[in-house]
């Protein structure tokens, strides 16, 4: 049985694809780096859309904030371009947000790797796992 997607999910998926291409092709501002649109969350009334994005090579919070500011300033232009590409009665207002899930995921992976390394060090300690316990019987 095929998965059922709501209308807002379908609109969000199409907006994600279109915005990725539009930003790459149309936004020539040097403050905007390599932007990846990770998700688009469209409201039920299709009036607003939260666009979650990451920027490759920009770990500095100021650079990321500047990129978001530029994209939010260009939201009207991007919305107009989306209206040309998509067959919608009204195109939602665009609100760009930084997607911190990628950074959080990398941090959690580092914590897990550190915990596994510490665990393996404790197991390799004074007693090896292959050693048999000594018998007290004579």
From Swiss-Prot:
Subcellular location: Cytoplasm
Keywords: Cytoplasm, Ribosome biogenesis
GO CC terms: cytosol
GO BP, one annotated term: maturation of SSU-rRNA
Cross-referenced Gene3D superfamilies: 3.30.300.20
Disordered: annotated segments: 116-138
Gene Ontology terms for molecular function: ribosomal small subunit binding
Major location category of this protein: cytoplasm
Keyword Cytoplasm set for record: yes
Matching Pfam families: RBFA (PF02033)
Cited HAMAP family: RbfA
Role description: One of several proteins that assist in the late maturation steps of the functional core of the 30S ribosomal subunit. Associates with free 30S ribosomal subunits (but not with 30S subunits that are part of 70S ribosomes or polysomes). Required for efficient processing of 16S rRNA. May interact with the 5'-terminal helix region of 16S rRNA.
Subunit structure: Monomer. Binds 30S ribosomal subunits, but not 50S ribosomal subunits or 70S ribosomes.
PANTHER family hit by this protein: RIBOSOME-BINDING FACTOR A, CHLOROPLASTIC-RELATED
Sequence similarity: Belongs to the RbfA family.
Name by which UniProt lists this protein: Ribosome-binding factor A
